[in-house]
């Protein structure tokens, strides 16, 4: 709770600066050194990316928004750290994943890497494959927002909890010739090259290239990570148009590193042999067996263009493509290991999977700004379409035929009769979406009114992977309204209220459940929110109160079946308070963080069995505070504390304990033979705490051990 107190004491202090970047529909301005939208301290930006509405000042937005800058991404996104290590700097986000699974929650609702946007385009990342080093900003809008984000394109989760958008690095006005070496874990070495140039008489063309090479052992025993990647961003800007093309390839291979566990259950409750959550074991040990691995490669293309055609009017187009192949995924059945008693004994069959995904996306829209009397209008009309297909392993051998694992959390895990068969993929599902969005922001004096509506239809087919014949089909459609109101009594204060919604496609149950291939009804998520924002003197504080209602998909056990069922059984309500603070706290002191209080309850469950009980795996308290001391222009120290409260699982039968972790780092800038060099040292999980994170649902995620990271960056 110490982080909660620290963040609350910062509270409503002061704030500064202005903004302008992008998400869906409007392209970024060319980035220059010393961006005006970045708050003092450089850890966050004062801009708010609002989907098809383009770029908005955070004070003009009727939602909670956060933008993490490249400084924050680099500081907390170490080579061996999961993506969530960066994302949790937003107090609405909680980590529920590992390096094997880019899983996280926003306001208690699960998301994965596959629900991320890149330059406003959905479906370009995956649960396993989401490189953060390509991003100059990571932007968040908390809460469901189909009305401004358009169509989803994810085979695992929707963006019901909020929108997370990666903004790719672009060439700056100054040439970039950057080489960076890293060392982390036990023997993990990384090399990163970053080159940027602008060309043309007015520097209208820009090229930015980022490469990655990473290989070696992490801080976890027998946990190897290998990655190679190259990404190129080409942009063009003149008086009447802006264009951006991002393209790239990445290969990622991880040996070992299993951290996801479940508890054996019966009829939705733990079996009699489990009376408590076992204490977290040594996080530095590997809880897999030799041969367990995950390896994938993928390509992405993202194209954005906007063109002025009249005074105050422009049209825009966005398109994206992602191909990703998970070549190997050898792990325990259901992607985790099962704890069967209080002693921490393990029993699991193994499985081997292969997944091939393809995503296509296209959007066309028009935006106009005009007046009707004293009213100022900013109107956007956009239509989009998305296609998605997935192939999965025809036979995953999770019936025990490829072997099993046994052992104990505290004494070691071993394999029994293990062999690794050849895996062939077969068509698993195909999705198509069609959507249209209309929004108008009306401004009058100190007030703004947002009125928007999104209509979309989805067609989902599931297939027998062995025969590739259709086994299920569902068509769905929905209208999602969005409306909000902002009133600014003076230049420092902004009060807002809003309503927003999200509607998913109707999901195909994954192969880890007994009802694999079944299509669940589309789940609708609705949010009402109001809040206040304050900015002054280099500091921004934002407080929001929200109420979210979502159709509740839950895991259910039935007697006579070896695996659980995944069913839509009722409704969940998430009521909470979110506070965020960013900027310069005092001379030489910068701060970023906040807290979230979340009361998540189940409603309308089968036979009322679990009505009023906590949503499984959702912590009531969540807080983060990052504090930086800049002694001078060359030396700084940064620390971060993260607190996650207790979380109920198995319908309040068990409870995952709270935990508090700390990170600490230093940066020193100097010159070697006239070459600017930045030396950095970072320690993640400073106290080497062993703890469980409650996975959304009834799972447990084991922490990563204390990890040191050293780097040297040369600006040639």
Where are these regions (language model features)?
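A beta-strand signature from Gram-negative outer-membrane beta-barrel systems
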Residues: 134-178, 203
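Structural signature of Gram-negative outer-membrane beta-barrels, strongest in the C-terminal barrel
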Residues: 357-359, 374-388, 427-550, 574, ...
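C-terminal beta-signal and adjacent terminal beta-strands/loops
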Residues: 646-648, 668-716
């Amino acid at each position: 709770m110490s982080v909660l107190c620290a963040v609350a004491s910062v509270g409503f202090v002061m704030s500064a600066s202005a903004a302008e970047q992008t998400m869906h529909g409007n392209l970024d301005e060319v980035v220059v050194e010393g961006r005006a939208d970045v708050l003092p301290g450089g850890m966050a930006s004062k801009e708010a990316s609002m989907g098809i509405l383009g770029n908005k000042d955070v004070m003009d937005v009727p939602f909670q928004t956060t933008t993490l800058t490249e400084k924050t991404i680099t500081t907390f996104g170490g080579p061996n750290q999961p993506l969530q290590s960066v994302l949790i700097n937003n107090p609405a986000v909680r980590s529920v994943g590992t390096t094997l699974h880019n899983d996280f929650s926003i306001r208690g609702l699960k998301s994965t890497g596959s629900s991320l946007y890149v330059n406003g385009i959905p479906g370009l990342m995956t649960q396993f494959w989401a490189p953060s080093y390509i991003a100059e900003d990571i932007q968040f809008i908390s809460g469901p927002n189909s009305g401004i984000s358009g169509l989803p394109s994810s085979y695992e989760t929707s963006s019901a909890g909020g929108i997370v958008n990666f903004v790719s690095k672009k060439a700056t006005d100054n040439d970039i010739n950057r080489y960076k070496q890293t060392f982390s874990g036990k023997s993990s070495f990384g090399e990163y090259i970053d080159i940027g140039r602008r060309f043309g008489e007015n520097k209208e063309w820009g090229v930015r290239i980022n490469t990655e090479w990473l290989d070696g052992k992490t801080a976890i025993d027998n946990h190897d990570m290998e990655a190679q990647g190259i990404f190129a961003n080409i942009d063009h800007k003149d008086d009447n148009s802006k264009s951006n093309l991002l393209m790239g390839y990445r290969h990622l291979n991880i040996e070992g590193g299993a951290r996801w566990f479940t508890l054996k259950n019966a009829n939705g409750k733990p079996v009699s042999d489990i009376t408590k959550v076992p204490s977290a074991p040594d996080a530095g040990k590997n809880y897999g067996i030799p041969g367990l691995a995950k390896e994938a490669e993928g390509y992405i293309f993202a194209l954005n263009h906007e063109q002025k055609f009249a005074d105050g009017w422009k049209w825009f187009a966005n398109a994206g493509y992602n191909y990703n192949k998970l070549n190997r995924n050898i792990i325990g059945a259901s992607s985790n290991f099962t704890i069967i008693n209080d002693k921490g004994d393990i029993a699991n069959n193994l499985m081997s999977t292969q997944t091939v995904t393809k995503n296509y996306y296209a959007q066309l829209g028009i935006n106009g700004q005009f007046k009707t009397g004293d009213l100022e209008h900013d109107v956007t009309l956009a239509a989009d379409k998305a296609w998605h297909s997935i192939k999965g392993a025809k036979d995953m051998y999770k019936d025990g035929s490829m072997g099993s694992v046994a052992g104990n959390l505290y004494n070691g895990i071993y394999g029994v009769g293990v062999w690794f068969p050849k895996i062939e993929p077969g068509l698993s599902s195909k999705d198509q979406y069609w959507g249209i969005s209309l929004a108008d922001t009306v401004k009058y004096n100190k007030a703004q009114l947002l009125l928007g509506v999104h209509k979309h239809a989805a067609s989902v087919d599931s297939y027998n992977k062995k025969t590739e014949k259709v086994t299920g089909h569902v068509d769905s459609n929905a209208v999602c309204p969005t409306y909000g109101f902002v009133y600014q009594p003076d230049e420092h204060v902004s009060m807002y209220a809003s309503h927003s919604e999200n509607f998913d496609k109707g999901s195909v149950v994954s192969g880890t459940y007994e009802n694999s291939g079944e299509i669940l009804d589309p789940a609708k998520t609705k949010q009402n929110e109001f809040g206040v924002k304050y900015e002054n003197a280099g500091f921004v504080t934002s407080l929001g109160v929200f109420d979210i209602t979502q159709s509740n998909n839950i895991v259910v056990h039935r007697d006579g079946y070896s695996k659980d069922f995944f069913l839509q059984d009722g409704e969940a309500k998430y009521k909470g308070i979110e506070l965020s603070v960013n900027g310069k706290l005092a001379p030489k002191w910068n701060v970023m963080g906040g807290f979230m209080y979340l009361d998540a309850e189940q409603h309308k469950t089968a036979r009322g069995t679990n009505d009023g009980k906590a949503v499984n795996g959702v912590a009531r308290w969540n807080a983060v505070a990052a504090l930086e001391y800049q002694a001078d222009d060359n030396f700084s120290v940064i620390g971060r504390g993260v607190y996650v409260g207790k979380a109920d699982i198995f319908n309040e039968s068990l409870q995952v304990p709270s935990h508090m972790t700390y990170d600490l780092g230093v940066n020193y800038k100097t010159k070697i033979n006239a070459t600017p060099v930045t030396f950095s040292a970072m320690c993640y999980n400073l106290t080497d705490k062993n703890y469980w994170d409650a996975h959304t649902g009834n799972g447990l995620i084991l922490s990563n051990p204390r990890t040191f990271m050293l780097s040297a960056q040369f600006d040639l």
